[in-house]
Amino acid sequence: MAKKKSKKTPDNVLAQNRKARHDYTVLETVEAGIALTGTEIKSVRERRVNLQDGFAQIRNNEAWLMNVHISEYVQGNRFNHDPLRNRKLLLHKKEIRRLGQATMDKGVTLVPLRMYLKHGFAKVLIGVAQGKREFDKRETIKRREQDRQIARVMKHY
């Protein structure tokens, strides 16, 4: 009998934006391809990506990933890329329109949550996110602590 492939392996995730889940409430997620140059994809495969300050924008009916740092490829010499250049996101026209409508609301933005490889192609998980206020963050932390305590108590019984 053939071995079944796991749907999601942890080693295909190249970068994760943990700060985004803390600072934003993610309303919806969309998987997007990303247009990269040769030295960029080589750096991405070496996991030299920082999504921390990144965001996405819809401009001229195109989706762009901004402010994501992909380090220069070590063996890239003079053909290396600019680490902070804007990169085009590959989405269907309907998805771009839907994301554009979602970002019209006040306080809603597009943030990259995760970058991973899928069938050899780099993909970005984009989240439609709404900013949290300070008390929302504290409430989330408090709720998480309570859940941990309940789990600890239930473990003993």
Curated annotation (Swiss-Prot):
Q: Where in the cell is it found?
A: Cytoplasm
Q: Which domain of life is it from?
A: Bacteria
Q: Which CDD domains match?
A: SmpB (cd09294)
Q: Is this entry keyworded Cytoplasm?
A: yes
| GO biological process terms on file | trans-translation
GO CC, sorted alphabetically, is: cytosol
Task: List the molecular function annotations (GO) for this entry.
Answer: RNA binding
SUPFAM superfamilies noted in UniProt: Small protein B (SmpB)
InterPro entries (UniProt xref): SmpB, SsrA-bd_prot, SsrA-bd_prot_CS
Q: Which UniProt keywords apply?
A: Cytoplasm, RNA-binding
Keyword RNA-binding attributed: yes
- Pfam families, from UniProt? SmpB (PF01668)
Hey, which family's this protein in?
Answer: Belongs to the SmpB family.
Its function? Required for rescue of stalled ribosomes mediated by trans-translation. Binds to transfer-messenger RNA (tmRNA), required for stable association of tmRNA with ribosomes. tmRNA and SmpB together mimic tRNA shape, replacing the anticodon stem-loop with SmpB. tmRNA is encoded by the ssrA gene; the 2 termini fold to resemble tRNA(Ala) and it encodes a 'tag peptide', a short internal open reading frame. During trans-translation Ala-aminoacylated tmRNA acts like a tRNA, entering the A-site of stalled ribosomes, displacing the stalled mRNA.
Q: Which HAMAP family match?
A: SmpB
Protein name listed in UniProt: SsrA-binding protein
